[in-house]
């Protein structure tokens, strides 16, 4: 409908790169007048506001501030005396205990939405290399070939490919989708689940407080 010039008044996209494509194609209205009228620049976090600015004008505003998180089955951890990991050493230790129980460490999958690959890459880059190093790479102050990034991705390969932390194997990760990995987490097929904050409402409805 966008290509046909019949798109809706408000369009939702996965992020700024998609907005830029629409803006370059002349499909979006400049929002500067609305921003001035309603004071959006004062109400939004500066980086959030600037994420929708292209060629000096505002074309989009973010709906949410999102991040990747790890959910764990609290009851399952308590039953087995497992400590919620706060370091890499603790994470690898509890992962071994989870696998010894015949469960998967994490559940997650990319069937139907391949960008989940970058979710996991982002988790490892930010938690191993650190957000400052990632920022420096994004701004051109550091090379992506820096050893700290190489080590982060080698660790992801170790956990995901070599040890099958996500849904038991890389092949399973590729094969399962939203309903599958939520069901696996809810039925104790996996002790933990990686997920984005944008799914919290749907995730809570599917899993429940228990």
Regions inferred by a protein language model and the residue ranges of each:
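Hinge/lid segment of periplasmic solute-binding proteins
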Residues: 14-68, 83, 92, 98, ...
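Loop/turn elements at helix/coil->beta-strand transitions in domains of secreted/extracellular proteins
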Residues: 5-9, 57-58, 99-106, 162-165, ...
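Solvent-exposed loop/turn segments at secondary-structure junctions
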Residues: 15-19, 66-69, 76-77, 111-115, ...
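Short, solvent-exposed loop/beta-turn-alpha elements that line the ligand-binding surface or hinge
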Residues: 30-44, 127-151, 158, 205-209
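Extracytoplasmic "Venus flytrap"/periplasmic binding protein-like
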Residues: 1-44, 75-86, 183-184, 191-192, ...
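Short helix-initiation/N-cap motifs at beta->coil->alpha
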Residues: 1, 16-17, 88-93, 170-183
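Extracytoplasmic/periplasmic solute-binding protein
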Residues: 54-63, 68, 92-142, 190
